[in-house]
Amino acid sequence: MKTSLLFYRTSKNANKEASVLSYELLEKAGYLFKTSKGIYSYTPLFQRVILKMTEIIREELNAIGGQEVCLPLLQSAELWQKTGRWEAFLSEKLLYVLKDRENKEMCLAPTHEEVVSEFVSQWLTGRKQLPVHLYQIGTKFRDEIRPRFGLMRAKEFLMEDSYTFSDSPEQMEEQYAKLRLAYQRIFDRLNLKYVIVTADGGKIGKGKSEEFHVLCSLGEDTICVSGSYGANIEAAQAIPPSYTYSSELLPMKEVATPNVRTIEDLETFFNTPRQQIIKTLVVKVHKKGSEQFFAICIRGDRQVNLTKVSSFLQADDCELASDEEIIKHLHVEKGFIGPLHCPVPCYADETTRPMTNFICANNQKDIHCRYVNWERDIPLPIFGDFLLAESGDLCPQNNEAPYEIFQGVEVAHIFNLGTRYTECFSVGFQDENGEKQLCWMGTYGIGVGRTLAACIEQLADSKGIVWPLAVAPFSITILYNGGDTEGEAVASQFYQSLNTAGFEPLLDDRNERLGFKLKDSDLLGIPYKLIIGKSFQKTGMLEIESRSGEKYNISPENLLDWCSKNLPCHTRKIPPIRE
């Protein structure tokens, strides 16, 4: 490809609206064009990157028996209502909803579990067809409340989604392991630093679930890592630093605490460490279209994990109750809520189980109780794991070694769904006894745009994008000083040679200074530069420089040999461009 024919432009100035590096560089380098809030057009440059990324995905999924399909973007509400997810997604206002001419409700697909389950239920003829792995690479839609970070959180985005159907839990686990390994190979080919972490299934399902996170400072997700084990902070089990409590139980006392509302206030007022105080939060739980309120107790030095609370209570969602809701349902102001005489169901985190002689509110304004003890003063609550993990907590899955905390961008998510969806759509087969058995389902997805944005966040430098060689739009840029007719002729000769061999060169044939072209090549993130400059004129040797700064002096006759050892060959993968 010649730069003069490439429909693109670069910019010297960053977009003031770009809040993250990946978005800034994609626009600055001519890869992305914003058409509306959270909606982007991919330029010819970026489409080449997309094609290479999706080719890697196809190669790895086809290698494990995946079969590509194309499922509809427009889906009926009726399908979603079968699984109960229509109401759940509507409550979060994430669906793009519309009606057809027959006044039937439809949505633009955020995911395809319902559609693929309906499809397989109609086409599965017997057990011999199992396991089956179907996948697609296509557009998804989410009406994000706050679309931001460019491709990280867009309203329209490109995803690969896979669906497996198996005849047993064991076969489902085998498929899960295959997809997990295939996803690892995909990210390994991008040379990214990533971790696989235990995760919460969210609204898709409550079965086994893991996320792939690319590590970078921008990451929206907090990742807890201990040795080879990792977990999203939403799902991380943790053992906090221990605290020694007295075995001598003291008589409970009521203490007037005017305007003493926070843990900090209590710590100062009683001159007592936070580990001796119980903090109680009120949560509002959404479950099957109704709202319920619960009190959650935790040790005063720790925070409640709302995702764990939601999972424990088998809720669709949960959030902290507002000040107004607390007064309405508990008849007391925030800051004076506690497990004593609590008017709503009360649960307690495991951190509170060993506590003795603790301080807590008793649901009266300006009153707290001291030297409170379980069983004697308060019936034992139902205990659960509601703890938000922190750096330094011990990891129960790794011989109680401490956690380190990192930021990550979620680029893929894999789930075992069991029979949740197959039961709704009667996806099954007849066993040897003639009885109907349900299929066991898995669902898996890679955010294509998010992965490429994460590449930039992790690998970019002060000069611009640094694409992994596997997905770079061009492998090597051929550069010469504009106006140098001899350099232009030599560059054109090498361009023809490399192009014929399938090494995807980009010939910068603009009438610009060599320094300008070098900066543009670095901004674009092209892995290598072939420079036809003063060195070639003096010595006849070609200078090749990698994006990371390594330099190679190559004789012209050895150029193809060097390229064959260092550059990928794409003779048939990317469609040819008219020259």
UniProtKB/Swiss-Prot annotation:
UniProt-listed Enzyme Commission number(s): 6.1.1.15
Gene this protein is translated from: proS
Leader sequence segment: none
Origin superkingdom: Bacteria
PROSITE patterns: AA_TRNA_LIGASE_II (PS50862)
Main location, first listed in the record: cytoplasm
Transmembrane helix listed as a keyword: no
Keyword annotations: Aminoacyl-tRNA synthetase, ATP-binding, Cytoplasm, Ligase, Nucleotide-binding, Protein biosynthesis
Keyword Metal-binding (UniProt): no
Biological process annotations from GO: prolyl-tRNA aminoacylation
Protein family (similarity comment): Belongs to the class-II aminoacyl-tRNA synthetase family. ProS type 1 subfamily.
Function: Catalyzes the attachment of proline to tRNA(Pro) in a two-step reaction: proline is first activated by ATP to form Pro-AMP and then transferred to the acceptor end of tRNA(Pro). As ProRS can inadvertently accommodate and process non-cognate amino acids such as alanine and cysteine, to avoid such errors it has two additional distinct editing activities against alanine. One activity is designated as 'pretransfer' editing and involves the tRNA(Pro)-independent hydrolysis of activated Ala-AMP.
Entry's Gene Ontology molecular function annotations: aminoacyl-tRNA deacylase activity; ATP binding; proline-tRNA ligase activity
Catalytic activity line of the entry: tRNA(Pro) + L-proline + ATP = L-prolyl-tRNA(Pro) + AMP + diphosphate
Cell compartments where the protein resides: Cytoplasm
Free-text note regarding domains: Consists of three domains: the N-terminal catalytic domain, the editing domain and the C-terminal anticodon-binding domain.
Protein known as: Proline--tRNA ligase
Cellular-component GO terms for this entry: cytosol
Gene3D superfamilies reported in the protein's UniProt record: Anticodon-binding domain, Bira Bifunctional Protein, Domain 2, YbaK/aminoacyl-tRNA synthetase-associated domain
